[in-house]
Curated annotation (Swiss-Prot):
Its main location: secreted. This is Probable pectin lyase F-2. The active site is at R256. Disulfide bonds join C83-C106, C322-C330. One of its GO terms (cellular component) is extracellular region. Residues 1-25 form the signal peptide. GO terms for molecular function: pectate lyase activity; pectin lyase activity. It comes from the Eukaryota. It comes from Aspergillus terreus (strain NIH 2624 / FGSC A1156).
Amino acid sequence: MTLIRTVLMAAALLGASAHAQGVVGKPFGFAAGTTGGGNAAPAAPSDIKELAQWLSDDTPRVILIDKEFDFTGSEGTCADCACCVPSSNTCGSSGQNAIETSFGWCGSSPNVTCTYDKAGTKGMDVGSDKSIVGVGSAGVIRGKGLRLTGGASNVIIQNIHITDINPEYIWGGDAISLDGTDKIWIDHVKISLVGRQMFVTGYESSGSVTISNSEFDGRTSWSASCDGHHYWTLLGLGKNEQITFARNYIHHTSGRSPKLGESSYWHSYNNYWSDNSGHAFDVESAGKSLIEGNVFSNVKTPLTKENLDGVFAVSADDESTCSGSLGRSCIPNVLTSSGELSSAGDGVFSGWLSDEGDLTLMPASQVASYVKAHAGVGKLGAGDYSSSAIPSSTPAPSSSALAKRHGGHDRHGLGHIPHLTEGGPGAWHTPGPAPSWSWRTIGVRSTALPTPSPSSSSCAIGKPTAGPPRFPIFGDLGIF
């Protein structure tokens, strides 16, 4: 009896310690200095209503996600509502149909009706000075994403799994969306089974952001590319935003991993891309990205061929060039069973807009094993972010020196998704028969195309915009 009582007491103390822990580690990269809820006493909300209230209020908080918060059905369903079959869906129920929007996204695509969960189409508003931290492996937010807008700043999102947001439907909802923010650290997060973007920034600058040690799991039964891979992965559109993207695991995707537009600047290092049946990087003319020390395994197209002036993807031949620009040697990328990754656009160096701080990079040969062991939920104790946690690392000097020289429940299988293997890429399908159709422009309607009338459905999402077609950033849907 005494032994049982001792074990129970130890378990209770362990639970209390976990609950009181809050944020683990410190942010690095562009989000260095982010404190979130700071010294606020960690507390766990009792239900989804209290969670939404705490996230959106003006009080600094450390919010513990100590269980699954399931928003499915909490705002009702839209039954028999207006949807369509886009030209990308050539595989029926294994593909993604699209929810019609009030700005007429479906256009002339064949109309169908569908039923979807309303909660997923708009994320929960998150205010400034918040730390949102999962406890152990228990922290799950199901059926609804997080939405940071309107000046929200100083936010930490750590060790949570966001999943099951209308994955059957394009425009079903986003997992994490930023627009007009600053100092955001996203760490040890897992995202899976979403209808639209796993992570997205809007047209207003998202400021200084670090995304680290996170898993973007694209395995799905509703694939826009009709091959079991998720297409809508990472989209950066904010003007002059600066994003450190480090030590993340991006797998089973087919595009937008990431897609960068406007003058979004990404420093992507020590990430592991695996089993991408389409493209990883797609950078628009104003976007900039320094890509170094990453591993691409079974990635069909690591980098699209257009607009390469602002992209520097480091190869073994580029180390001296990088040294002359940054004052250090860059780390070459490694590709296995993948397409080409070749771009030495020096325009990226003039786009380094503020101090990214001192960084620690590891050789690409160590990336795959490190990232698989550390990225995602339930792994906060697997290592910190200091140089001692990463073997054979190479410190990178702060970018201030550069600036001086040069003047960014299982409804769908959670819990029984098979373990990721190292098998080859999924079968490649050319999405859609129309020759003018392009995956890279889906969701971006040319001004030359006719603008259809807004849907009359009471469940249509989004808000119409004035002037030339420009997709809403954060209406009742998220972002394209």
